[in-house]
Amino acid sequence: MRHGLAGRKLGVTASHRAAMFRNMAVALLKHEQITTTLPKAKELRPVAEKLITLGKRGGLHARRQAHALLRDDVIVAKLFDSLADRYKERQGGYTRVLKAGMRYGDAADMAVIELVDRDPAAKGQDSGPKPEVASDEDEAGEAAAA
């Protein structure tokens, strides 16, 4: 019997679920808005809310707890600097889940989860490392060496 068990399994193992929510939390805090399935968005909401509350609490212990979950120094710094300041007057309710229709391939319910009072400029930030652009000096050095 499954009486009183909280949370959804989402059809994956526990380790996969933990990794998935880690990745989704990092993406949400970086872009401040992501699109995913409705059950995943509903399960991600308390994770994100607790992370923002950790950021508001501040201190070394809270920073280490956030880093243990996120494992991304840049996102932890954003969480404790800009997001903590943005939500210092708000007592919870830092995210919203908006239904976004159905996915074409399998008709899964889709949703947009976003931070309340989000920064529109954060949407669509580059997800990967910056590609190195060869400068004129590098090209001249390579030509001379050849």
Swiss-Prot record:
It comes from Acidiphilium cryptum (strain JF-5). Residues 134-146 have a biased composition (Acidic residues). This is Large ribosomal subunit protein bL17. HAMAP family: Ribosomal_bL17. Part of the 50S ribosomal subunit. Contacts protein L32. Keywords: Ribonucleoprotein, Ribosomal protein. GO terms for biological process: translation. The gene is rplQ. One of its GO terms (cellular component) is cytosolic large ribosomal subunit.
